[in-house]
A protein has these predicted regions:
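Catalytic glycan-binding domains that act on GlcNAc-containing polysaccharides
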Residues: 1-144
Length: 144
């Protein structure tokens, strides 16, 4: 898939070239080249591995991880650090200062709830999926 965003993200998972290079190295994909980012299987592998990396780095929070996937992990961490008290994930999502990221998070997580129900027959409410976001000092990680 040859889809490229205005900021340079490529493929089905819209992975940035530097992020793809980082993830490929981390998962041992020794044959990676930037041209392979256009290959759907490679793109899915890199994008899903990166999403898992940010999910782990952000304590399993789907709200923070989806925001990080779109705007970068350092921004998600900064937004969480600025909280004064724990808030519902929906409230946190509504306070994301970037319109694109705020919309992305809402779309991704509402679709995840819907398709999870379709695929498994078990629904997880959007509120449950969003959880609660508690303040936490931002700790720098190596994730791009």
């Amino acid at each position: 898939m040859n889809a490229t965003s205005s900021v340079g993200a490529s493929g089905l998972m819209q992975v940035m070239p530097n992020t793809a290079k980082y993830v490929a190295k981390k998962i041992g994909m020794t044959s990676y080249t930037q041209e392979k980012l256009k290959d759907t299987n490679t793109n899915l592998t890199l994008g899903s591995n990166y999403l898992n990396m940010v999910l782990v780095d952000l304590d399993g929070s789907w709200v923070l991880a989806s925001a990080a996937y779109n705007a970068g992990p350092s921004r998600s961490k900064l937004w969480r650090e600025r909280l004064n008290a724990p808030v519902e994930g929906a409230i946190f999502a509504e306070t994301i200062p970037f319109h694109e990221t705020r919309t992305y998070v809402k779309n991704v997580l509402s679709n995840a709830s819907y398709y999870s129900g379709v695929m498994t027959g078990q629904t997880i409410s959007l509120k449950q999926r969003l959880g609660t976001i508690a303040p936490k000092a931002a700790i720098q990680s190596e994730l791009p």
